[in-house]
Swiss-Prot record:
One GO-annotated biological process of the protein: UMP salvage
Record note on cofactor: Binds 1 Mg(2+) ion per subunit. The magnesium is bound as Mg-PRPP.
Residue sites binding uracil per the record: I307, G312, D313, A314
Catalysed reactions, as listed in the record: UMP + diphosphate = 5-phospho-alpha-D-ribose 1-diphosphate + uracil
Keyword Transferase annotated: yes
Cofactor needs: Mg(2+)
Homology family: Belongs to the UPRTase family. Highly divergent.
This protein's name: Putative uracil phosphoribosyltransferase
Domain of life: Bacteria
Activity regulation details: Allosterically activated by GTP.
Gene: upp
């Protein structure tokens, strides 16, 4: 780690960049050039008063994005630990993921709709990681239905048995934006498990210093406001579900700290709706036996370390905006999700409450 002060662990951007190879840096530079070309056309595209100018800009944007997509596909072939949904699935699935990500990005997508598409996104990511193949052993679901005449009816459904993949998992939550996505993935694990396995939760309070730029960014891990047991993480399959992976700094900071405590994860899986390529590469270069699953890969970061084109602040869009001097704690966040979400994720809420209350 870079440093530890007053129950805080701090990692600096340079620590993360040291893991990048020359080839990584070349690819990232090439993508910066391509995206700069696209940005040069954005203002012209906005100028709807000049139809011909706007049409030419649209053509350039589409052509540039095609080039960006082709280059990122080439990069991901060289890094098998990066799993991008549209690169890993059949072509008939690509329209669905494009529409889901487009709705998440859209500035006009309101809170309820954003939550709906967030749930869809992480369900898709779960299937990408754990959905099972035709070769895997099958198990049967025998379900009692509401039809009771002339006798009580039951339905039988055959599914892949993925218990061995999911029943050693612990959800690792980077507060606060990752709370709901982690509950969604935990719920999927419970539903796919033939034993109704409910994941334990480890809760980590970490933030980056937004007064800094991307090149000198610091990631501050607050141990006093985190809830976890290192002993209960050792030998486990650690799962991180966070809406966005911009720089990878928060995730690497947490895992490196756990490793310093002697934790040896069996595996690490990271689920994201959108990742920046730089952040995704940093994660898989820095951490052994780690796989990044992302619904969409974006090409670049801006100087403030935000993903471009991105979708804004995912934490604010999922949880609402906190008052700066009075940020909500985890219990307040859970309460603000309301009865519909609380009812759906009842088992997950119980585990989270046990983690928070049992750590003090």
């Amino acid at each position: 780690m870079e440093g530890q002060t007053a129950r805080r662990v701090i990692t600096e951007a340079k620590f993360l960049d040291d893991c990048l190879t020359e080839r990584d840096s070349y690819y990232l530079s090439k993508l910066d050039e391509l995206y700069s070309s696209a940005m040069s056309s954005f203002a012209q595209f906005e100028d709807q008063q000049n139809g011909a100018r706007s049409a030419r800009a649209e053509e350039n944007i589409i052509a540039t994005y095609d080039s960006i997509g082709n280059l990122m596909q080439e990069i991901c072939k060289e890094l098998p630990a990066l799993k991008v949904y549209s690169f890993e699935t059949q072509r008939e699935n690509h329209a669905e993921v494009s529409r889901v990500v487009s709705k998440l990005r859209n500035i006009h997508t309101g809170y309820s709709e954003f939550i709906y598409y967030t749930q869809r996104a992480f369900e898709m990511l779960f299937r990408l990681a754990y959905g099972g193949s035709h070769e895997e052993h099958k198990t049967y679901l025998i379900t009692k239905t509401p039809v009771a005449f002339p006798v009580q009816n039951y339905a039988v459904h055959k599914i892949a048995n993925v218990d061995y993949k999911i029943e050693n998992t612990v959800m690792c939550v980077m507060l606060r934006g990752a709370l709901l996505p982690s509950m969604i993935v935990s719920k999927e694990i419970e539903e796919y498990s033939s034993h109704g396995y409910v994941t334990p939760f480890a809760l980590f309070k970490i933030k980056r210093d937004d007064l800094r730029d991307e090149r000198d960014m610091q990631y501050v891990f607050d141990l006093d406001k985190s809830y976890f047991s290192a002993r209960e993480l050792d030998g486990k399959d650690l799962v991180f579900a966070d809406p966005m992976n911009a720089t990878g700094g928060s995730l690497v900071t947490i895992v490196r700290y756990l490793q310093d405590l002697g934790v040896k994860p069996k595996s690490i899986s990271c689920f994201h709706m959108i990742s920046a390529l730089k952040g995704a590469i940093r994660v898989v270069r820095s951490l052994e036996n780690c796989t990044v699953y992302t619904l969409w890969m974006d090409p670049v970061l801006n100087a403030r370390a935000y993903i471009m084109p991105g979708l804004g602040d995912a934490g604010d869009r999922v949880n609402g905006v906190d008052v700066e001097d009075y940020p909500r704690n985890i219990i307040q966040l859970l309460a603000d999700y309301g009865s519909n979400i609380s009812g759906l994720y009842r088992s997950q809420l119980r585990k989270i409450e046990e983690t928070v209350l049992g750590s003090r």
